[in-house]
């Protein structure tokens, strides 16, 4: 039996390494066709992004592609770019904030299979969705956290806002955060410049009506104003008709809720990566959720087959070169007579 096996192997070897390489390449390709996989854990992400659509987000002190745009437009462009940085299998939902609460527009869906739907929903979010001039950011953030906590997969919250409270927030009468800080992870993303600018006034159809004047807005919290009223309070006092990024206020809210804060900087041109770190923030390892997955290993036997075929080709070239050298030596050793 052993002698027969040895004889079989000897006959196979006598066929030459050329056929061995070809057979091994065919075997490797056959393995690749079996779709081999291995169990791994993939870091995936699950977010709900809430966009502030109140009137101060229409101030054009943001930049996209080197051009001034409204704060909301910069936020939308940065998010549109960041969608491409989330790995397939991750989920993202969209919401908006207006008046004093957040609203869920689209529950988290898988980003690759639903990229067009996410971008279409994002494209339809604009300032016309704000049905009131109020902008109670702290309450909106707290309700956004409640939404994220109530969703089945407990996504992280990304709350995008300029932090402009209208009417102004008095620390003595401000809302209290009743949840456990850090129960919902995520980011507060600040949008806007640091120089106060007039807030555009628009009608329900989004048409411009000029800018808000000092005598058209509240410059103090109504409850505090009524308690501390003086004869001069009837006159406009303050600059609440102007808006800038309220970074200090947003940092306080982040500390209170256990979220992180980042400022949205210049966004790259459409189609490119955001100039800010929004994409990196959405894919921060601390927000990743290891999910069991199967890694495709077809590339390994396919690569092996390619290398075997390349080795066979090189072997044939070497054999051909050897034959040519032998023929040349034979011709030199036996010259024909003239």
Segments from the language model and where they lie:
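VWA/integrin I-like adhesion module and closely mimicked acidic/polar interface patches used
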Residues: 163-248
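Juxtamembrane amphipathic/hinge helix adjacent to a transmembrane helix
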Residues: 46-50, 255-298
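C-terminal signal-anchor/stop-transfer transmembrane helix together with its immediate cytosolic
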Residues: 2-43, 280-338
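Alpha-helical transmembrane signal-anchor/signal-peptide segments
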Residues: 38-55
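DG-centered beta-turn motif at the end of beta-strands
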Residues: 29, 52-54, 75, 94, ...
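…and closely analogous acidic/polar surface helices at protein-protein or active-site interfaces
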Residues: 44-45, 57-91, 110-114
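Short beta-strand-loop
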Residues: 90-124, 147-148, 274
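Second-shell loop/turn segments in exported
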Residues: 61-72, 81, 104-108, 125-134, ...
